[in-house]
Amino acid sequence: MKIWVDADACPVVIKEILFKAADRTKIAITLVANHHVRIPPSPFISFMQVSSGFDVADDEIVKRIEANDLVITSDIPLADEVIDKSGIALSPRGELYTKENIKSRLNIRDFMDTMRASGVHTGGPPALNQTDRQNFANHLDRIITQFKKTQ
């Protein structure tokens, strides 16, 4: 298992949780973004900068993931592609995307895009709170624990 992070929009506090998990579990984490992201010195943490452009980081992640790799993203279409490649997709809020829920999440996303395109102001998601951070950390620990049991 390798952990990939769609780092362009990943909150700093979530990256910090991931950095600690990488050192604690010795699982490799790669952050992918189209701008520089500071990472701590660690043999388990790397950064890949891609060129600017629509979905360039997403496409790079999809190209490189393997079955059972974990991808941290709030991008619903990316999560869908990860699931199609037998990967695991987890949002920074701790929502585990699955075959059972990804299509409805895509439909909601598409509906909201349509609303925004027609001029309706839909607002953004609420700020990440302590419950979201705890939910993310708990799901991350469960996924890593399951992976370690299979090793």
Swiss-Prot record:
Q: Between which residues do disulfide bridges form?
A: none
InterPro entries xref list: UPF0178
What Pfam families does this protein's entry cite? DUF188
NCBIfam families associated with the record: PRK00124.1
Q: What HAMAP family does the entry give?
A: UPF0178
Family membership: Belongs to the UPF0178 family.
What protein name applies here? UPF0178 protein CPS_3584
Starting at the broadest rank, the lineage of the source organism is: Bacteria, Pseudomonadati, Pseudomonadota, Gammaproteobacteria, Alteromonadales
